[in-house]
Amino acid sequence: MIETLKALCKLSGPSGFESDVREYLRAQAEPCADHVVEDATGNLIVFKKGRVHVKNPPLLCAHMDEVGLLARRADDNGFLKFSFSG
């Protein structure tokens, strides 16, 4: 699990540009999932059937994107000024 977390942290995924994260998650999920779907907005939906029927099956939701930073300029003292994306 630690190696998976490290791999995810190394991926770039600012809002609107999450494809690297999505493809990594798809590759990790497909071997153990019953069905994997990407919807029109890029959400990755993974289905895994349980061994028994339960009234309220568990659901795991998470963001794939991260806040991105754009360096806009450097001031006279060499400090960078950033804008956020996402």
Specify the residue positions occupied by each region the protein language model found:
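N-terminal hydrophobic/helix-forming segments and targeting peptides
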Residues: 1-86
